[in-house]
Amino acid sequence: MYVGKESIDRLRLDEAFAGKIAHLPIADCICVKCDERLLVVDDEETKCSRFGKEGDDVGKALMVINEKKREIVLLSIDNKLLKGIQGGIADCALFDDKQFRFVEFKTNAEGNAQKNFDKATSQLKNTIQVFRDRLQAVDVMFDDAVVLSCHIVLSHNFPRSMATTQNYQYEFATDTGGIMLSFDSETYWEKPER
């Protein structure tokens, strides 16, 4: 049994997302890789997140540095596991037996930066609550089972300031019980995001 399967079983994701809430079964929404460098993209054609491949725009991706080559599960959430969730939902999650990171892509966002930041943080908070509720229904305390964190992936030319991102990070942590929010387009997997 591989780490990804153990993580899915331990979190009881199949049970938590069985029935009417799920658009597709968990098994149809995951991909597992253990490469040293993993690119995660939100596919513009399928409108679903996936691991990247040659030719994908690195400027619109999350690069995961996985030096220990741990198995990382990509769970495609928006338009795959869940569809039409009121309040919006994160694009995907990356996880293993220790960490669970929600990812929201805003790489095509234009115009009002505050509006885009507000929408992305709202979608992430809503996703956290959906997962907390679904997992609690199957007796899994999500926040105790894994280290939770979130990423908002923006295009490199999206306007933002250090003060703005820090304010959003502080507000997000306050609103979610301490969950870290990152705006970096590159992350190290071994370093817990808490």
Q: Model segments located where?
A:
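Domain-level recognition of nuclease-like catalytic cores that cleave nucleotide substrates
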Residues: 6-13, 17, 145-194
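Short acidic, S/G/P-rich loop/turn micro-motifs used as interaction or catalytic elements
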Residues: 80-82, 108-112, 157-161
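Catalytic centers of nucleases
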Residues: 85-96, 120
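Catalytic cores of nucleic-acid endonucleases
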Residues: 114-155
